[in-house]
Amino acid sequence: MADKILIVDDSIDNRKLLLKTLGKGDYILLEAADGKEALARAFEFLPDLVLLDVMMPELDGYQVCEALKQDPRTADIPVIFLSAKAETQDKIKGLDTGGVDYITKPFDRGEVLARVRTQLRIRNLMKELIDKQKRLDEDLRAAAVIQMSLLPQSLPTLKEIDIAWKFIPCELIGGDIFNVVLLDENHLGFYMVDVSGHGVPAAMVTVSVSQVLQPHSGYLKKKSDSPPYYKIISPKMVLEALDREYPLERFGKFFTMVYLILNIRTGKLIYSSAGHPPTVLLHPQRPLDLLSQGGTIIGLGGVIPFKEEEKVLSKGDKLIFYTDGVVDFQNQHGESYGEERFLALLRSLEDQPLELILDGVCESLTAFGHQARVQDDVTLLGMEFKDIS
């Protein structure tokens, strides 16, 4: 489609000269004899470029340009000023009011054509860039919807435990997911994953991992020939399988993960961590424990073998899973929230109900950051062991 150029000059001779100069090009040419007519035609036709005379009656070129820049319909239209004034301060004034270039009279035909072509090329490139950015924004919004859909829609409701979670997404699309999976009538699986990076690539890996970690996928439990005709896979073996499935060279992404299996009848748990921040075990009236046993991140091909650890929960014990978006959160001074501050807060809140503990962490982050946006997803998952009777 041909570019539209609006020529604004109170001199009919100048307009004719410009029409003749540009007439051989593939342009749609529009005219205006003064500032008021220029604004009316610009708002009606939305040209791709305006050639604007400076010295005109009533509204001069600077005033017209300012009016164009103040209206969102015409703010992005490039304006080239036309003037017999060649002083530096006149050119500066034109650029300050929103012009992109300045052509002095009398016109040189070659210069006019070159400057017009240049500004139209820049405008068309800007249009392409804006269109690409819009498509990218749409992709990111779609990825955000996908990420939110991966968060637990419902969690197991059992008398033996309470479960609560909080998720604060960052502006960029992150790669945090978590879930609580009912493996059988006695066992729950808890996992939390943090994929490296942001944006659509991280979201795609997140989707894939979430599908793999479904109970029916064969990664968390598999069929057996003897009663009960299934076998729950240990955390160590789950991480090893994921490490084989998601090599760094295949996806260009790695991820940290913690996977924990809890027997809700006995309180016995077994877990393993792949480079993930340690799960916090809060005991009533006793020092907390950090569950950090495991190996390296998923994607490095088992550089460090994964290990497991077992614990037995007592009534009132709480588990707090989290991603590094909590401790790495920075305020406006570049100071990190940090693990020490986080653990001290958990100790001060350990007697509170689970929901209030997680709320307290989010409130503390907000106060620390003075309303600053989180730089990474903040993900918290809590569990309280209530009864073994």
Task: State where each predicted segment sits.
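Helix N-cap/capping motif at the beta->alpha junctions
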Residues: E31-A40, G61
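C-terminal catalytic subdomain
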Residues: V312-F321, V326-S389
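… and, occasionally, acidic/histidine-rich disordered N-termini of signaling adaptors
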Residues: E128-I320, H370-S389
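Active-site beta3 strand of CheY-like receiver
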Residues: F45-V54
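Active-site residues of response regulator receiver
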Residues: D9, D53, S83
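Two-component/phosphorelay signaling modules centered on CheY-like receiver
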Residues: D3-K4, I12-L30, A40, E44
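Receiver (REC) domain active-site loop signature in two-component systems and cognate sites
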Residues: M56, L68
